[in-house]
Every structure is written in C-alpha cells, then in structure tokens.
C-alpha cells in the first residue's frame, strides 16, 4: 500500500470534517445557490434552463422540479434538441464544456436577428479548455449577452447521502483493455477532484502499488489536486 500526501492535506481535512452536511446535500446546495440563485439574482425576467444530457443526470440526482421552478425558471429544455426561440427570457445553460455543447450554444446565437434568449448565464460542470474559451470569445453576440460565466466543478452523480457514481458506462472496458492512448484514468481522476472540491477536502491518497491501474489513477489524481 502506498500513499500520496501533501502538507496541507491534514489541515484541510480537519476543517471540512467538522461539517455534518452529506455529499448529496453539498451538491444540492451548490446547484441551488451557485447556479439557480446566482442566475436569479442577475435576472429581472423569467428564465429557461438548458442542460446537456450529463448535466441533466447530475441535476436530477439531487434536485427536483419544484426546487427549480422556485428560482423563476419556467421551462427546462435539453441542449441537443431543437428549441423554440424565447428572446424575451434569459437562458441559463448548465452543460459540460465539450465541443458539442459549446458549438450548440454558439449556434443559439449565430443569428443577430434571432437570438435564442435574452441575457445568458453560462455554468459548466468542469473547467472550460483554452480552445473552447477562444471560440466563446469570438462569438460577439453571445459575449454581449453573458451575465454569468462559472465553472461549478461537479462531475458525478450524488445518488445517495454519502455515495457517488462517476456515470462512466465504458469505464471498466477502457481500464482493463487499455490502449496506450487511453485517457480513462485521467478522466476518473478529474471527476474525483470535483468530488473533493464539492466537499472542500484535500485527502490522503492510498492505493495498491501492485496495480498499474490504481497507480495511474492515484498519480493523475495527485497531480490534478496539486495543480
């Protein structure tokens, strides 16, 4: 058994351990406060919530429709589907920062005469890459409408009070039948980092040294935590 640790790990862990909130409560609070309440505070109109498939699963694991409607959100729509323009309402996007999601958001504001929504609040599950950020910066109409831009660091499903699911259907196959170009361990590590960010934890990392899979995930997780 091996361990990665940082000098700040114990201090951060002791501070967060005082909290009695469950993981599920932390995720729910983060979504309600950092996403919906934040957008509501900057919007004078009713809002439309637009989510990609992954964001929809993340939200559905902790938040009900009543919670959403309480925040002046009148409609919930899927990003990938054809949607009716509602230029009198503000759009709240909660999506993963994939190329597909970014391209769809840009398409919503590609026609200056027919913008999909009024003002825009952009919330991303994970950090936006430099390449995707550059594409957003070049979209002048979209830029003029952005009132919120935030990366909330939630990339897992909080299905129970203190357990979570990474929602990776092909994970086992990719890890066991790994090719030299496989990124599975880095993706898993990145998702685990969002769990720690949600809990405000900086953990000690213990792993089975004889397992190359465990070593790779532990090393990647450690690197992303300290970066």
PLM-predicted stretches and their roles:
Residues 1-227:
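Extended, well-folded catalytic/binding cores that form a central cleft or groove in large enzyme
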């Amino acid at each position: 058994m091996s361990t990665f640790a940082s000098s700040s790990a114990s201090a951060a862990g002791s501070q967060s351990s005082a909290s009695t909130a469950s993981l599920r409560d932390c995720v729910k609070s983060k979504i309600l406060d950092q996403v919906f309440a934040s957008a509501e505070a900057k919007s004078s109109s009713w809002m439309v919530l637009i989510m990609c498939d992954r964001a929809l699963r993340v939200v559905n694991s902790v938040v009900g429709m009543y919670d959403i409607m309480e925040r002046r959100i009148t409609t919930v729509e899927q990003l990938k589907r054809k949607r009716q323009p509602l230029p009198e309402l503000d759009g709240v996007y909660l999506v993963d920062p994939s190329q597909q999601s970014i391209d769809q958001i840009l398409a919503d504001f590609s026609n200056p005469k027919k913008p999909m929504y009024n003002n825009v609040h952009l919330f991303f599950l994970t950090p936006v890459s430099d390449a995707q950020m550059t594409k957003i910066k070049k979209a002048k109409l979209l830029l003029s409408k952005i009132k919120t831009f935030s990366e909330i660091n939630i990339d897992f499903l909080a299905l129970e009070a203190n357990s979570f699911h990474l929602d990776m259907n092909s994970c086992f196959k990719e890890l066991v039948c790994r090719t030299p170009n496989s990124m599975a361990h880095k993706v898993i590590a990145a998702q685990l980092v969002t769990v720690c960010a949600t809990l405000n934890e900086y953990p000690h990392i213990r792993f089975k040294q004889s397992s190359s899979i465990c070593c790779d995930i532990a090393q990647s997780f450690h690197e992303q935590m300290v970066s």
